[in-house]
């Protein structure tokens, strides 16, 4: 096998990956609107959701920090809108990215409250609580590091329930603390719940990823337990009423999309019930309900949980809850993508530019792989040197395939040549390439990250297609510089058009990935010349002009 056959193998592997990727794409069918709420779950979160009367909406209050702009409904204390000021909606846009939304076209909310026998969010106890607040807008002031938003509700029996949102400067983790004051003569049985609900089908103005075949990242629910560190749960599975219903001590539930996530992390010593639910009308939910606790008469009970609402910043997420950083969708090659991203981030801490960081990491990766590359070219050179003997053998033995196979193996053994030696290094390179693809698609740090000149977003395609064309040119030079023994006309035609085929494929790929491939090809050209010089000295290569 020679260099040009390697290009053919790369193309076949690449196309196979794209076909598999398209097949794996999480395209959820839009469910028919259901007017009746599903009864396959007994989770308190979904019951609380159903308990909100249409005519009993509370008022909306604004809560702002340097990184979060939340809108909270005093009816139940749900977060109905979340804007992220540090992340523009689009490149060069003044509008912040909106993660949570409540509109006629799309629902995505973070709900929470107190259920159980005596909880105010239990539908059996009437509408969800209408909390009282001191003001309609809360803003984290300059020099202030923490913002508290207390909300109080007193039921007919005189019991007081306080729900306090605690936000910190520069933090996307929101603590939700509950205090229950029992003014009665009997114990109160209380459970906490946290629920994330979202429209299964994205409206056209949000469904930007489906127009680009290269942008395939997971959108759906996920959860973590001590036994299962990270498990995805597809929206279409929830739509089919195949619902989650497990008990866990610790863990979290979440909803994910490219670059951003929301998650509820319960904080208690007991067991939590993790569930999913089809709420009808094309809305899916994932949530938790805690084990009930008793608040004795005259006593105060405290419960709390944490809501993550923001970008998937791995180190910050890992500090909030174990394995929460796994929500970054690096696909099945996460074990390669994660170390690569850590290395890329370390390089960026010195360079300050993600594009130059990609260039440097490309040199590092190709440098580490140089021994494999050298072994690959050496093996191919030896195979080329054996071609005259192999051809003579075929002419001598005619159609006796068994004899040909036996004598070829004997020849390989005598000459100490591994016929698969040219393939193995190639198979090692492909997972690294795919891992880089997943890393660029899943790392929010690279979202809208500029490089230089016309490249203002490394996570988006080149607007002028200059990088893909340059990539095709480098492939063409590699092809022309590589010796070949391919005689089959069809293979020759395929390899002739290979740079064009790859260029077309890469038109829609993120600029960062194309940049990596260009630099990798340039390194290949340099390494190729160094290796060929060494092979010439050993008599394994000749710089005679390639036959056209």
Swiss-Prot record:
Keywords: Cell inner membrane, Cell membrane, Chaperone, Membrane, Protein transport, Transmembrane, Transmembrane helix, Transport. Residues 30-50 have a biased composition (Low complexity). It is a multi-pass membrane protein. It is found in: Cell inner membrane. Its main location: membrane. Pfam families: 60KD_IMP, YidC_periplas. Residues 28-55 are annotated as: Disordered. GO terms for cellular component: plasma membrane. It comes from the Bacteria. GO terms for molecular function: membrane insertase activity. The chain crosses the membrane at residues 6-26, 350-370, 420-440, 458-478, 499-519. One of its GO terms (biological process) is protein transport. InterPro entries: Membr_insert_YidC, Membr_insert_YidC_N, YidC/ALB3/OXA1/COX18, YidC/Oxa/ALB_C, YidC_ALB_C, YidC_periplasmic_sf. Interacts with the Sec translocase complex via SecD. Specifically interacts with transmembrane segments of nascent integral membrane proteins during membrane integration. Belongs to the OXA1/ALB3/YidC family. Type 1 subfamily. Required for the insertion and/or proper folding and/or complex formation of integral membrane proteins into the membrane. Involved in integration of membrane proteins that insert both dependently and independently of the Sec translocase complex, as well as at least some lipoproteins. Aids folding of multispanning membrane proteins. This is Membrane protein insertase YidC.
